[in-house]
Amino acid sequence: METVLIALLRFYKVAVSPMLGNRCRFYPSCSDYAREAIQYHGAARGTYLAVRRVCRCHPFSAGGIDLVPPPNSDTRARGEADARSHRL
Protein backbone atom coordinates (compact mmCIF):
# COMPACT_ATOMS: atom_id res chain seq x y z
CA MET A 1 0.00 0.00 0.00
CA GLU A 2 2.87 2.36 0.82
CA THR A 3 4.34 1.81 -2.64
CA VAL A 4 1.05 2.73 -4.32
CA LEU A 5 0.66 5.90 -2.25
CA ILE A 6 4.23 6.99 -2.92
CA ALA A 7 3.76 6.32 -6.65
CA LEU A 8 0.63 8.51 -6.61
CA LEU A 9 2.60 11.27 -4.88
CA ARG A 10 5.36 11.04 -7.50
CA PHE A 11 2.76 11.28 -10.27
CA TYR A 12 1.29 14.36 -8.58
CA LYS A 13 4.72 16.02 -8.33
CA VAL A 14 5.59 15.30 -11.97
CA ALA A 15 2.24 15.79 -13.72
CA VAL A 16 -0.01 18.01 -11.59
CA SER A 17 2.18 20.17 -9.37
CA PRO A 18 4.01 21.98 -12.21
CA MET A 19 0.66 23.19 -13.56
CA LEU A 20 -0.42 24.56 -10.18
CA GLY A 21 2.83 26.28 -9.29
CA ASN A 22 4.56 26.47 -5.93
CA ARG A 23 1.75 27.25 -3.49
CA CYS A 24 2.80 25.36 -0.38
CA ARG A 25 3.45 27.59 2.62
CA PHE A 26 5.53 24.99 4.40
CA TYR A 27 8.93 23.38 4.10
CA PRO A 28 9.11 20.61 3.05
CA SER A 29 6.29 20.88 0.53
CA CYS A 30 3.07 19.05 1.36
CA SER A 31 3.79 16.30 -1.17
CA ASP A 32 7.31 15.76 0.21
CA TYR A 33 5.87 15.78 3.74
CA ALA A 34 3.30 13.15 2.72
CA ARG A 35 5.97 10.92 1.18
CA GLU A 36 8.17 11.15 4.27
CA ALA A 37 5.23 10.57 6.61
CA ILE A 38 4.20 7.43 4.72
CA GLN A 39 7.78 6.14 4.66
CA TYR A 40 8.36 6.76 8.38
CA HIS A 41 4.93 5.94 9.81
CA GLY A 42 3.35 3.55 7.31
CA ALA A 43 0.35 3.98 5.04
CA ALA A 44 -2.41 4.62 7.60
CA ARG A 45 -0.68 6.97 10.06
CA GLY A 46 1.35 8.62 7.29
CA THR A 47 -1.80 9.40 5.31
CA TYR A 48 -3.43 10.79 8.46
CA LEU A 49 -0.44 13.08 9.09
CA ALA A 50 -0.40 14.16 5.43
CA VAL A 51 -4.11 15.03 5.44
CA ARG A 52 -3.66 17.06 8.64
CA ARG A 53 -0.78 18.91 7.00
CA VAL A 54 -2.72 19.69 3.81
CA CYS A 55 -5.59 21.04 5.93
CA ARG A 56 -3.12 23.44 7.60
CA CYS A 57 -1.79 24.68 4.25
CA HIS A 58 -4.10 27.57 3.41
CA PRO A 59 -3.77 31.31 2.71
CA PHE A 60 -4.33 32.27 6.37
CA SER A 61 -1.59 29.96 7.65
CA ALA A 62 1.79 31.44 8.56
CA GLY A 63 3.54 28.37 7.13
CA GLY A 64 7.20 27.77 7.90
CA ILE A 65 9.23 24.68 8.67
CA ASP A 66 7.04 21.70 9.55
CA LEU A 67 8.92 18.42 9.65
CA VAL A 68 7.42 14.94 9.93
CA PRO A 69 7.46 13.87 13.58
CA PRO A 70 9.80 10.96 14.30
CA PRO A 71 8.13 7.55 14.62
CA ASN A 72 8.78 7.35 18.36
CA SER A 73 6.99 10.64 19.13
CA ASP A 74 3.48 9.25 18.78
CA THR A 75 1.35 11.59 20.88
CA ARG A 76 -1.39 8.98 21.26
CA ALA A 77 1.08 6.57 22.83
CA ARG A 78 2.26 9.28 25.22
CA GLY A 79 -1.33 10.15 26.13
CA GLU A 80 -2.19 6.51 26.76
CA ALA A 81 0.92 6.09 28.91
CA ASP A 82 -0.10 9.14 30.95
CA ALA A 83 -3.61 7.74 31.37
CA ARG A 84 -2.24 4.39 32.58
CA SER A 85 0.01 6.10 35.12
CA HIS A 86 -2.99 7.90 36.64
CA ARG A 87 -5.15 4.82 37.15
CA LEU A 88 -5.72 3.66 40.71
From Swiss-Prot:
List all membrane-crossing ranges: none
Name the principal localization, coarsely classed. membrane
Q: Which UniProt keywords apply?
A: Cell inner membrane, Cell membrane, Membrane
Q: Where is the composition biased (Basic and acidic residues)?
A: 75-88
Asked if the keyword Membrane belongs to this entry, the reply reads: yes
State a single Pfam family of this protein.
YidD
User: Could you tell me where this protein is found in the cell?
Assistant: Cell inner membrane
Extract one GO cellular component term from the record. plasma membrane
What is its membrane topology?
Peripheral membrane protein
Q: Does the keyword Membrane apply?
A: yes
Segment Disordered: which positions?
Answer: 68-88
Role of this protein: Could be involved in insertion of integral membrane proteins into the membrane.
Q: Which family does it belong to?
A: Belongs to the UPF0161 family.
Q: What is the protein name stated in its UniProt record?
A: Putative membrane protein insertion efficiency factor
Q: What is the lineage of its organism?
A: Bacteria, Pseudomonadati, Pseudomonadota, Betaproteobacteria, Burkholderiales
